[in-house]
Every structure is written in structure tokens, then in C-alpha cells.
Amino acid sequence: EEDKKFLLEEIYPYWENRCTGNISRYYIDEKIMKVLDSPYRVFNPLSRTRSGYGHYLPNIEKILKIGFKGIEEEAYRHLENLDLMDLELTDKRNFYKSMVIICEGVQVLQHRFAELAANMALEETDERRRKELLLIAENCRRVPYEPAESFYEALQSYWFTILIDYCGQNGSAISGGRVDQIFYPYYKKDIENGVMVKEEARELLEALWVKHSDIIKAGTYSSAKNNGGFATTINFVLGGVDAEGNDAVNELTYLCLDAEKSVFNSEPNTSIRVSGKNPDRFMKRVIEILVEKEGGKLPFFNDDIIIDALRDDGISLEDARNYAIVGCVEPTPYGNTMGRTNSCYFNLAKCLELALFDGKCQMSGQQMGPKTGKFEDFTSFEQIKKAYEEQVEYFVKMMVSSLNAIGKLHADYTPHIYCSMLLDGCMESGRDCTRGGAKYDFAGVQGVGMVDVGDSLTAIKKLVFEEGKVSKKDLLEGMRTNFEANPLLKYVLLNKAPKYGNDNDEADQMVAYVGKQYCKCVRQYKNLDGGSYRPGLFCLSSNTPLGKQVCALPSGRDSGTPLGDGGVSPKHGMDMLGPTAAAKSVAKVDHRLASNGVNFNLKFMPTILKTDADRQKLVDLIRAYFSMNGMHIQFNILSPEKLTEAQKHPEKYRSLVVRVAGYSAFFVELDKDIQDEIISRTLIGA
């Protein structure tokens, strides 16, 4: 109570007008702030003002090779060679001096841990544990300041590097990258030299997996709704190809899978890169773990389409092949990219609502968007498409403006010096990563509700303009009243127009149009540092709170209910023809345009994956879907009965991990609305 009083009466009042969250109001245009202050909005970038950006891949390999000692030496060299006539002289001098101070701080921190472990060893009576503590102390005296010389030191160096980053900027999704590639040289050397055996390496990996549960980021109310659970989304990646395009699966890949199976916690968010060059043995091992652990983790990513998408973004072939996943599903070049991969969610379904009501929000009655015409007066389907596109373009422009303002805010108030030390390009340019210093610079923005919009447009085209089964007046009235006075209308909308997810070209191409229009609209803009805006088609759990802001839709969706899950997944219960048809529909969306990532969820009954033949069919499904240029797929393998039981008796299911969207979480820690949404997803059974 004393701490609470101190926080409420002294700490919070002091920071109220000093924190970046409040200062952002002076950076974002007043017209846009009025939109953001409304409880009903198309986008909300303000969570990016309350912490550092996170969402990037630090160059861990560099730290392992040269240590922070090497970083410090580089900074000193650049200080000595500064051009006195450089117009950025003062900024660069301060930048490099800040790096030196941080490197000195890293030494202080690791030595504190070394001292703690040594003191614990003095009091330890168990000889085995005493030796472990002494080894920990020895490692902490060396790394991460010095280069790592062993597998154990490499893991310890990595953990310090990540931990310091989280403490420093309080961001999310600062990810580990391709751990089976990064740590393999140290593993191979120690095995060949007899320093350790596989079982010891596996135990160290398991300890590393466990440590990732130490980092819990407490979010704001809104961020907790958009990202259910306590996911930090530190992503590990296994498999794929190397920089030369060859199979990258190695012995350490399988040990990492063993560690994942043994620990199987919500963190780290371990992902699987899939190439046609990877052996089926690798895929089958992943499927075995998925089935045994009832899914909930280990999403699959398609190397071929992702590498092509990154090349379209201007990434070199070598860097594109060395991509890893940031956070949930965001493909990002490793160690050289200021990605800002989860900058904002954009509510596409709200734009359709506004397009049908001449820019007026039906939840508040206020004029929110531009006047794009009254649906009652439209004489062709093309007019509603045009109105929808104008609403999207209007709000995307606002979103970009606000994000650029937030970028300036971070550059002015919260330079990410530590992050800059871990990104190629910043040291060389003398610029912080918030000021365009990294080799590559992007911002990722996610379109949410693509399928809801596509299915709604299909219904309008077919039932209103082509067949005349539904009048414009009845449709608008049904949307206003949530179909309460006309339940038959809802039935017709749900059942008499084709739905995405059933390999129906009419429905699928409409959804593909919605995704393409959003992606192209986003791609025309640059951020303050000249980097591109990269579109994504995923939602984490934001489809639930964003759905609360949208009235009933022509697809038959009720007012305030969740928008489509995943991002490119078919709507719950609408994919009636099984997983193959669903996958074929999803593959018709141009994933290559959505280079910031997509999310495709499937849910299976455990009973259909019992035998080796069943599991091989799942491997074949994944490879077939990827051959059609699908980017991502992931699975929950649970019965709805078990999830319902866990909802009723959470104390019995505290370790139940589920796949929410692009991340995993303990089911019992999720908001009930998100639990209900997961339970309601289409279940594929025998």
C-alpha cells in the first residue's frame, strides 16, 4: 500500500506531462489527434509512444565474435576520425561517446552477476551445483564484453545482450534470430574438441528456453487487448537456407527442437523456415512435436516467397536469404534493419462501414471519414469500391503522418543507442537507428479485417447489384440495427453469397483485391528516414477489440463481434470444404505484396493426426500450400471441449499453450473475449 501511494501521489503525477506518450500530442497533427481521441477509430499508433520500438533483430553474431569490447574500440576509432567540418559533428560525437558509456556499463553489469555467482558458490554445499556456479562466474567475467569462446559463453553472451536491450527500451519482440545458425560454430567446435557432449548442449539450450519466460512486459489496457496474454514474442528461427541458398538444417537444429519440446513454454516464439531443400525428416520432427504438444507453437514460413518479397523491398539476395522472423510473423533481414515491424493496426472493416454510410460512424453517429457518397444513390458496384478505396487512402495517409511524427518524437527524446550498436550501418554512418542509421529502414503496418471486407463486397456485388435479392435500404437498415428486425436478411447474407475459404474464385479474388489495394496504398509512402512502409496482413488478437468498433457488415457478421482471425484466415465456420480448399483460397491473396507478414491459422482435432501417414499428409499440405506461394501457416491441435473446460477451470490448465495469432500464450491468461474467439475457430475433424 505504501508503494502504491508513492506511485499514485508522486511518480505518476511527475511523469504525466513528461512521458513520450503525452508529449506525442505536440508532435501529431491536431486534426489527427481528434480522430485518435475518439473511442471509434480506424487506426491507433499511440502504443508506439509508450516504449521503445523493439521489433528488430540485433546482430548477435557480431557480439559473439568481437564482444562489446570490439564495439567500444570501433566507437573510439570513429571518434578519433571525426571530420571537424562535418555538419553532424556534434551529434556523431555524442553518439559514439554514448556507445562507449554503454559498453562500460555492460562490463559493470556482467561483473555484478559474476560476483553474485561466486558468492553463491562459497555457500553452496552441493558439489555439482558449486561447480556450476563457479563456471557461471567465470563466464560472466568474460562475456558479453569479451568475444565468446565456447558454446556456453555464446549462450550467456546472447542472453546478456537481449536482457540489456529489454531493460533499456522496454520494447517488445527484440528477437533472437536464426539460433541454429548463430550458435552452430561454437557448438561444433566444442563437440569436436570434446569440451562437451550433446546432452550437455541440450541442457544448456533448455535453460536458455526457460530464461525467456523471465521477461514479461506489462502492457497498457489497450495493448493488452490487442496482444492478449503476456507475450514478449522473442522469436527464434530454425531451418531454411543459408546465404548461398543451400539447406541450413544442421545437428543443432534438432537439438533446438528437442529443447522446444522439453520446455514448450509460451516463450520463445520458435518459428520454422521451410525450403524445398530442407529434408522431410526435419518437417516430420516438427509435426511430431506439434501433435504431441497439441499445437500452439512452431509456425511455418515459406522461404521462397519471403525471399522474393524481401528482394522486392530492396534487400540484397544474401541478406534476404538470411532473414529471420521478428515478433510474430514479420520477415526481416538479420542484424542490419530498423524494422519497426508492428507500428500500427489498420481497421479495413471500419473503412467499409464508412464507405457505405458516406463517412459516418454508425457506432457513434459522428462524421469520421470523408463524404464519399451515399450507398442508396450508387448505381454500380464500382462506385462502392471507389468509395471504399477513398476511405482507405484517407486514413492510411493519416496513419503515415502520425507514425512519422512518432518517429521524430523518438529521434528527439528516446534515441536507441544500444539498439544502434547492434545494427549494421549505424556505427558506420554515425547515426542512431531512429535517425536512419541502419543499413535498411522500414515501418510495418498491418491491415485487419481483409476477409470481412472481401466477403461483404462479394455479398453486395452478388445479392444487391447482380441478383437483386437484397435492397440497399434493407442492407443499410440491417447494418444499423444489427439485423434485429430482419433476421432473414442475416441468413441470406451468410448463406446466399459465396465465402472466402472454399476455393471459390469469385469470393477469393474479392478478398485478394482488398489485400492488394491496402498493400499498394501503404507502399507509396516513405518514413522520415526515407525507408519504406511495409504492409502486413495479420492482427495478433487485435481483431477482437477492433471488431468492437465496427457495426454489422454485409457479410452477415454481427455488430461488435471479432473481425477475421489471423489476417488471411477464412472467417470462422465459413470454410466448409476442408483444409485443402482453405489453403487454396488463402494462396490466391498476393502474399508477396504483404512483405511485413501474413497469418494463416488452422485448427485440427487431435484424432486426425494419430498415425505417421496422417502426419505425412500434414507435411504434404504445408508443402503444397507453399508451392502456391503461401507465406505462413500455423496450427492449434485441440478440441473445443478442452478449451471450454480450461476456461471454466483455469487452475487445471495453467500450462496449456495455444496459438493466438502470430504468437503463443497460456490460454488461461488471455482475455475471455480472445478465449472465445479461439474456441470459435473452424475445427477440422475426421
Language-model region placement:
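A conserved hydrophobic secondary-structure block that centers on an alpha-helix together
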Residues: A121-E124, R128-R130
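Conserved catalytic cores of very large enzyme subunits
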Residues: E1-Y96, E132-L135, N139-A686
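Extended, non-transmembrane alpha-helical coiled-coils
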Residues: V108, R112-E115, N119
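Extended non-globular scaffold/tether segments
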Residues: K97-V108
